[in-house]
Amino acid sequence: MTRSKTSGSIVVTFLLLTCALFAQDPPPGVGAAPQTTPIYTPKFHGDPARSDSEAAALAYMRVVIRAQRQFNKQYNHFATSLAELVHSGSFTKRMVNSDRGDYTANFKGKKDSYVLTMTPKNMDAQHRSFYAEDDGKIHGDETKPADANSPVVK
């Protein structure tokens, strides 16, 4: 082999090895961005939710509260079950299911009052518990199940 062919082979081999080294993934923790909680984008001006899961839970509560107001106006008493609310306002048959994704809904109704709670499957700063009754105010708590004494969600 001539000297120029040998030099050319060495250069090509060097370039191939360099490309192969740079194409490999870095080991875990090297050059990787730190894992952070995704930033929540509010759904509307004044949105009190801290995550998409909270936004869905609060939206569900607002639908139930509006349906109860409409039901009470029409029948002069509150619905005693979620099934009674079907077709009141925008409350649908599928909404009777208490499994609401990251939350579980609990409804206790009487003709003169009701209590609705949304309990997260894992409570943390982005998954607070929520509570509402017939006054329509939604209360929230990030450390324990929310109740009437918990702060009102703004």
Predicted regions and their residues:
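Bacterial N-terminal signal peptides that target proteins for export
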Residues: 1-11
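Bacterial N-terminal signal peptides
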Residues: 9-20
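Extracellular/periplasmic head regions of type IV pilus-like filament subunits
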Residues: 25-52, 63-69, 73-127, 132-137, ...
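Conserved catalytic core of two-component sensor histidine kinases
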Residues: 58
